[in-house]
UniProtKB/Swiss-Prot annotation:
This is Ribonuclease Z. The lineage of its organism: Archaea, Methanobacteriati, Methanobacteriota, Methanomada group, Methanococci. GO terms for molecular function: 3'-tRNA processing endoribonuclease activity; zinc ion binding. It catalyses: Endonucleolytic cleavage of RNA, removing extra 3' nucleotides from tRNA precursor, generating 3' termini of tRNAs. A 3'-hydroxy group is left at the tRNA terminus and a 5'-phosphoryl group is left at the trailer molecule. Pfam families: Lactamase_B_2. The gene is rnz.
Length: 317
């Protein structure tokens, strides 16, 4: 069983507070660790969690405001200091390459490992990275500058109907693996058995979405529903009484995030990117006031710095 965890390294907005660092979210999927946004001080936050900078091979930047990128220079320098050799892939909107190039000019450093930067220019949802068992989709959002939400989608292989394969005379052993991988084999009678004869549709894979900073976008919610999104991490910078401030600054409120989650039909919504104007208790009380009117069936969680979630146990269970 693949281990999937979310670790919130920072959950604050433009200005950090005593309780909330600048934004940064780590997602563990098996042996992979993905970092979504990298605000100031993120590498120190990692020291209090199970996240190792050396295990991060992919960084996804939603947009180029400082609270989402100012942790990159220090993180890269620490990776170099500890002798990293493996390539690091960084994805982000137009201008990301220049940010990374400038980061490498700051001070004396030991960065000798390869860094590959992928800039995103799309105005439509598009797969920006794909492996055998997952893909990452970028979805354009609205925040005044080029910005993207990111969607992690697990890819499941078709299942093998072993009993049917036996009845068709397939040898138990390597031939079953070949069929599962899409290769035809010969049965004990010398007949060709094609994969489609014995393969069942794959089970639905896990799907996670992170909004980044954005105005509420109904089309985003509808798109996530089409994908079968399970968990949505959505910014909720302001409470519902500050709708004008949210709109003016191109952010979302608690209610906005809940509405998008409802459209997406998710199992869990995690609110993050919370303004420093609220202390921890105040935001929680406003949240309770705001969500009373919604009475939704999905879980709603307020993110906290250094809090981790086992996705299957804590969010989908």
């Amino acid at each position: 069983m693949i281990i999937m965890k979310l670790i919130f390294l920072g959950t604050g907005a433009a200005v950090p507070s005593k309780n909330r660092n600048h934004i940064g979210i780590a997602f563990k999927f098996g042996g992979e660790v993905f970092l979504f946004d990298c605000g100031e001080n993120i590498q120190r936050q990692m020291l209090f969690t199970e996240v190792s900078p050396m295990k991060i091979n992919h960084i996804f930047i939603t947009h180029l405001h400082g609270d989402h990128i100012l942790g990159i220079p220090g993180l890269l320098q620490s990776m170099g200091f500890f002798g990293r050799e493996k390539e690091l892939k960084i994805f982000g909107p137009e201008g990301t390459k220049e940010i990374i190039e400038n980061s490498l000019k700051l001070g004396t450093h030991y960065i000798e490992f390869p860094i590959k930067v992928y800039e995103i220019y799309t105005k439509e949802p598009i797969t920006i990275y794909k492996e055998e068992n997952y893909e990452i989709i970028a979805y354009p959002t609205e925040h005044g500058i080029p910005s993207y939400a990111y969607i992690f989608k697990e890819i499941k292989k078709p299942r093998l109907d072993i009993e049917k394969a036996k009845k068709l005379g397939v040898k138990i052993g390597p031939d079953l693996k070949k069929l599962k991988n899409g290769e035809a084999v010969k049965n004990i009678y010398g007949e060709i058995i094609k994969p489609e004869y014995v393969l069942l549709p794959p089970k639905k894979g896990f799907c996670l979405a992170y909004s980044g900073d954005t105005l509420p976008l109904e089309d985003f919610g509808k798109y996530l529903k089409e994908l079968g999104c399970d968990v949505l991490i959505h910014e909720a910078t302001f409470d519902d009484s500050a709708k004008d401030a949210a709109k003016e600054n191109m952010h979302s409120t608690i209610g906005d995030a809940v509405n998008i989650a409802k459209l997406a039909n998710v199992k869990a919504l995690i609110l993050t990117h919370i303004s420093a104007r609220y202390d921890k208790e105040e935001y929680f009380n406003l949240y309770k006031m705001n969500v009373k009117q919604y009475n939704e069936s999905f879980k709603i969680i307020i993110s906290e710095d250094l809090k981790s979630y086992d996705i299957k146990k804590d969010l989908l269970g």
